[in-house]
């Protein structure tokens, strides 16, 4: 049986630009090598039309619907993004319509519990190795108060991990919840890479085991009929639908089954963790873009102020024969700081008082 995977990340205003560009595929150069741009046209949004620009549209929705008249804090969590998926084998058994229904069913669970209108985007990516959905929920309570801490607290997260797989199963999808692990934490990039290398080794061992299993099956198929009859003649082996194995082999098979389940769940978890790391990268790129824009704006403002100061200095010189103090021009970046010999304590004191008497630029 496959696992239902649901993982949440918190997004603030600064994160929404980069995440929006990634989720909506607004950029052509992707750092994610798993993206196949030839399949990007297969992506879709289950609530299409609600959000075009993640940052401006979501902020507008919050401001229009929040109960309080006070401005939202700059560091407030505006969206809780859920990544919903399962393992690759699970989706290979579904057709396009069934895959869409899987994500629609998961979305409906959150709509029933957290408000359909609060789901501002539910983008399904079909252009990566495993289909998955990025679903953004504005954490409004019933009183339209914004509080991610209260809406998605620890109890709520545990409830979702229990209820969502059951909800999906009740709607026809053969999935179960992952292993309970209260000690699980988000992996750092080095930890993630190390874990991925370990999984590669496990995958190799798994392939070797499968090859041995195929070889063993071939040998079993070649067993002579007289050997089969000899076994079948035993009282305990009258049922031809059953086979016997040694106890040691049985224990080994049971252990491999447990290991396989743990391996599959850990593999899915790492795939989702990988998406989270890519989200972090997208957030950083978005933040970097905003900082560059802010820097450009400030540079233009500085240039404007320098022009005003320069005009004032020229006006005073032309009309009154005086100039602005050199310290003012130095502070405005219109003149290189003069190099002077070290001042005496009295000169420093006088200069200090002189500076306090005039306006500061």
UniProtKB/Swiss-Prot annotation:
Residues 331-361 are annotated as: Disordered. InterPro entries: Mob_Pre. GO terms for biological process: DNA recombination. GO terms for molecular function: DNA binding. The keyword DNA-binding applies. Keywords: DNA-binding, Plasmid. DNA binds at residues 44, 114. Pfam families: Mob_Pre. Belongs to the plasmid mobilization pre family. This is Plasmid recombination enzyme. It comes from Lentilactobacillus hilgardii (Lactobacillus hilgardii). The lineage of its organism: Bacteria, Bacillati, Bacillota, Bacilli, Lactobacillales.
């Amino acid at each position: 049986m496959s696992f239902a995977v649901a993982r949440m990340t918190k997004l603030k205003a600064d994160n929404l630009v980069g995440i929006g560009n990634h989720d909506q595929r607004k950029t052509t150069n992707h750092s994610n090598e798993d993206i196949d741009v030839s399949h990007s046209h297969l992506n879709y949004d289950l609530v299409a039309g609600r959000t075009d620009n993640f940052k401006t549209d979501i902020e507008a929705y919050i401001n229009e619907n929040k109960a309080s008249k006070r401005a939202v804090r700059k560091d407030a969590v505006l969206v809780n993004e859920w990544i919903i998926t399962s393992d690759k084998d699970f989706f290979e058994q579904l057709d396009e319509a069934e895959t869409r229904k899987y994500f629609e069913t998961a979305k409906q669970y959150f709509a029933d519990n957290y408000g359909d209108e609060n789901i501002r985007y539910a983008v399904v990516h079909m252009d990566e190795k495993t289909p998955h959905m990025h679903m953004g929920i504005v954490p409004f309570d019933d009183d339209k108060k914004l509080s991610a801490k209260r809406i998605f607290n620890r109890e709520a997260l545990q409830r979702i991990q229990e209820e969502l797989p059951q909800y999906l199963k009740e709607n026809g999808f053969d999935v179960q919840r992952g292993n309970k692990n209260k000690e699980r934490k988000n992996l750092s990039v080095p930890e993630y890479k190390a874990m991925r290398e370990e999984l590669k080794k496990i995958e190799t061992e798994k392939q070797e085991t499968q090859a041995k299993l195929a070889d063993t099956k071939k040998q079993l198929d070649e067993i002579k009929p007289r050997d089969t009859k000899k076994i079948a003649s035993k009282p305990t082996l009258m049922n031809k639908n059953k086979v016997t194995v040694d106890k040691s082999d049985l224990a080994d098979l049971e252990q491999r089954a447990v290991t396989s389940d743990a391996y599959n769940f850990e593999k899915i978890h790492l795939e989702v963790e990988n998406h989270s790391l890519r989200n972090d990268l997208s957030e950083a790129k978005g933040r970097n873009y905003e900082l560059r824009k802010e820097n450009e704006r400030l540079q233009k403002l500085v240039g404007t102020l320098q022009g005003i100061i320069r005009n004032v200095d020229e006006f005073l010189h032309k009309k009154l024969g005086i100039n602005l103090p050199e310290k003012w021009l130095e502070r405005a970046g219109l003149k290189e700081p003069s190099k002077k010999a070290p001042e005496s304590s009295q000169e420093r004191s006088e200069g200090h008082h002189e500076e306090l008497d005039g306006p500061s630029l």
